[in-house]
Each structure stands twice: as C-alpha cells, then as structure tokens.
Amino acid sequence: MVGVPHAQADSNRDPKVRAQNVSDAFSVPDVADAEHPVAHTDSEELIATGADSALVDAAQARDEAARLAPLRLMAVHAHPDDESSKGAATLAKYSADGVGVVVVSCTGGERGDVLNKKLTIDSAEIPALRIREMARAAEILGVAHVWLGFHDTGYHEGPPESWDLPAGSFGVLDPEVEIEALVRVVRQYRPHVMTTYDESGGYPHPDHIRCHVVSVGAFEAAGDPDAYPDAGPPWQPLKLYYNVGFSRSRITAINEAVREQTGEGPYDEWIKRFSDQARPDPGTRITSQVAVADYFHVRDAALRAHETQIDPDSTWFAVPRDLEAQVWGTEDYELARSLVDTTLPEDDLFAGVREKVSS
C-alpha cells in the first residue's frame, strides 16, 4: 500500500515537491482530460489554491491515517457538502473510533448556486471556494477526502427525459470511465465498507443518480483482477450501504416532537412534498441504524463549513439537537451488498467485518 508521504523533511515544504508526493500516491493514467480526469486529494487542491501549509499538512495526515487504519470506510458522494448532510455524524463517529474514513466527491460542485443569502459571490469564485469549504468540512469530520475529478452536471427540474444535460459533465459521460476512476481510488484506499445513494439518488439530481451507478459498479469491479487491470491491485470491499437520511418516518417524528414543544412544525412543507411524491419512502428499506447523537454537533459544524451551500438560518438547524437525539438519535442505512455474515437489523456498519478482519 502506498501512503501519501506526510511533509516532514525540509524539501517537503516546497509546494512543488509536496504536490508530486500527493500525485505519486495514485496510480493514474498517462493522459488526463475533462472526460478522463485524475483523482486527487484535498492536499493537492489546497496546494494549487495557495492554502496555508498547516492545512495541507493536516489534510495529508488525515489521508495517511485513512489508508493505514485497520478498519476503513469510504463514503461516495456526488458533490462537496453532500457528505455533511447525508451521514456526516456516522463519519465523525467512526473516525473518532479509529476507523480510517475517506470521502470521495465525484464532482466539484461547480454548477451549484450560492444558497446563503448573506453572501454575495461571483459565480467564477465558486469552484475555489468549494475546495476550501470541503477541506474545512473534512477537517471537522476528521476524514480524508478525494476529488474524483468530474464536472458537476447541475440540478435540473422536471422528469429525467426532459433534462438537457451539459456536455462533458458527470451525468452524461460513459459510466465505464467513471467506474474505472472510482475503482482506482477504491484500490488505493482499500475500504472494507462503502456508502452511497440508492438507485433514486436520494432525490432526482442527475449526479446523485449517476453516483449510485458508479458506486455500485466500482464495488462490484474493484475486487476483480480482470476488471480495469491498469487501475491498481484488486481490492474487494465487504459491504455496501445506501444512505437513508430523509425517511418520512424520521422527518415526521422530529417534526411532531418540535410541534409539541413550540406549536409549529419546521418540516411541514417538506412533509407535504413527501405526500406529493410518487416514489416510495426509503425508510421502509432501513436495515441498519448507527447511534450518532453525540456527533450531531460535529455534523452541523461540517455542514456550516459549506457556507455557500447552506443558509445558517434554514430549517436544517431549526431542530433542538437534544430533542432530535431523544426522538431519532441514529443515522440510517440500507444494506445493499454484503460479502460477510451479518444479522439484521444492525447497529454497526462493520458488523461481520470486524470478525473477518481480525480472524
């Protein structure tokens, strides 16, 4: 296993040397372009944007720790900020427990709007800002982070058949190219457990739907020596989970608990949208619930780090966390694939994995 060298020698204070150290950690194709990007770590992006050396060192240290830990978890998301709104407390908990955690962002979120009304930002600034925001969120969660390198497709209204997706974006490229890119990262970090979205993407965003396709494809191909032989030595993850963050049962339970205290339900409009949707409630598919109430404050801090993407006065933060902990103190998942024996329901994503790894 090749780790990212942590900057210790004097020569590593040179940004060019440190950037080469990061690049050397990946087995990458000889040619990179918009349709065949090279995955890169937070530290490489921070160097490119002129970030303080302490931030770079911290990112490299988290990356090395994620590779060397005896148990390893990879969370695959569509955009920066998704990791902080979907399963963030789980990532923080496992990181605090000594699990090596790496987040993979399939795109850079370049087409995201500025959702914080307090900010006035030119659209040209968004890509660099989102790099910094993601680095801060990763530091708060205690996780490593990898950019898969594809371009954001942007959100599109209406049914999928009406979408006019931009050329060269994540949602329209050949999925095989994207799967190979993620297989390369899986084989580098060797996770025992992976998390991503279900086939609906969690909500109808083309990048979220494609993230599901790519994540499942990589889980199934990474351990096959005949699949993508140039993407590094094979490694087979043992379990794949889908995030179930916004089940109707969870949102309704929290909403009614707040209403009992205040007379108002912060999620009333959200619940109405649920009733208008044709797709089934993902909550009916929950198999695994991880107790993470002690890390809700970490989750919130990580989400606030994405300041262009979240209004600090939004309903995301309208629920008292002690009340949320009492009503629904877990983050929820659907076990989609398992190559180890386990008993459902679970309270640990590593159920069955710990025994296999230690044997």
What kind of region is each of these model predictions?
Residues 2-9, 14, 18-30, 38-189, ...:
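Active-site rim/loop-helix segments in enzyme catalytic domains that contact anionic ligands
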Residues 2-9, 13-29, 43-51, 55-60, ...:
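C-terminal accessory domains and tails appended to enzymatic cores
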Residues 81, 107, 134, 145, ...:
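Divalent metal-coordination and catalytic microenvironments
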Residues 83, 110-113, 199-206, 248-250:
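Active-site environment of divalent metal-dependent phosphoester hydrolases
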Residues 101, 192, 235-239:
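Residue-level recognition of the N-termini of beta-strands and the immediately preceding loop/turn
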Residues 149-151, 196-200, 206, 242-245:
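Short, well-ordered beta-to-alpha junction loops that form the rim of enzyme active sites
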Residues 173, 203-224:
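A mobile, often basic/glycine-rich helix-loop segment
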Residues 178, 182-200, 208-211:
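Proline-aspartate-enriched helix->loop->beta-strand connector
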